[in-house]
């Protein structure tokens, strides 16, 4: 993802609307096929078809909530990456929300059944936990149980499907085999919905996203007005690309902290 995550991606896509837009999966392909230059005889990293396909078709419910799974063929490796990504950001988002005091354990116990279940298990097993230890154990259990359920259910799906090759997978009507069980998925969806309604839509998070979008927009405009602000060695080998695409490449490769630092140097 570019700096400031999905908010940054939306801004770059808007700024690049007249230049084929910006989408982070396609940008990842651009990086590994063109921008990374490790070898003298060809651009990119010379990755396998399976890896490139996984990058191109990587998706999560946050990225593409309305995407029909049957619309896109995904290798098993790509499906594993997708669910691993979801497992990670679900746990990290809960942890971030609690640490930021946007959500409380009491809120989650009251409104999210899977959180309530895990809390009861931990409290019956441990006594005298500090708040920090409790939250750590809750996130550990959330991650572990997601992994275990995904492995168990996916193994059953693969066995039932009879898939033994890429060709077999391509011929399936339902190609998504790496997934949670329906019952477990319902619990995770309840947690995700609660996060969306009470964390992602939080006023402070909204303000933070708007700040990130402002930084990216101002950087883009500044670099567009004075191309020399970009290090020459960065764009020297990309002379065939449009100025806007080079600027987009440069900004999308920044970290949050580097983008903020560049903004402060230019505008403070």
Regions found by a protein language model. Name each.
Residues 1-18, 22-25:
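Aspartate-rich (DDxxD/NDxxD/DxxxD) Mg2+/diphosphate-binding motifs
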Residues 25-27, 31-268:
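Histidine-centered, transition-metal-coordinating active-site segments
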């Amino acid at each position: 993802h570019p700096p400031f995550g999905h908010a940054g991606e939306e801004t770059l896509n808007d700024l690049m609307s007249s230049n084929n837009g910006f989408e982070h999966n396609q940008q990842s392909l651009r990086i590994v096929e063109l921008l990374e230059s490790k070898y003298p005889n060809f651009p990119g990293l010379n990755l396998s078809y399976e890896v490139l396909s996984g990058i191109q078709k990587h998706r999560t419910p946050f990225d593409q909530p309305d995407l029909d799974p049957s619309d896109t063929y995904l290798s098993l490796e790509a499906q594993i990456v997708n669910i691993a990504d979801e497992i990670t950001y679900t746990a990290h988002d809960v942890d971030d929300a609690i640490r930021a005091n946007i959500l409380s354990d009491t809120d989650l116990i009251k409104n999210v059944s899977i959180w309530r279940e895990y809390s009861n298990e931990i409290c019956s097993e441990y006594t005298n936990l500090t708040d920090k230890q409790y939250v750590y154990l809750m996130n550990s259990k959330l991650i572990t149980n997601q992994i275990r359920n995904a492995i168990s259910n996916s193994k059953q799906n693969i066995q039932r499907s009879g898939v033994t090759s890429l060709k077999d997978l391509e011929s399936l009507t339902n190609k998504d085999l790496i997934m949670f069980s329906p019952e477990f998925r319902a619990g995770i969806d309840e947690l995700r919905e609660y996060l969306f309604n009470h964390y992602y839509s939080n006023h402070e998070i909204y303000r933070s996203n708007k700040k990130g979008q402002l930084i990216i927009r101002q950087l883009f405009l500044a670099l567009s007005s004075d191309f020399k602000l970009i290090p020459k060695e960065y764009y020297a080998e990309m002379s065939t690309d449009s100025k806007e695409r080079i600027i987009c490449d440069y900004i999308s490769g920044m970290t949050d902290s580097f983008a903020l630092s560049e903004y402060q140097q230019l505008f403070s």
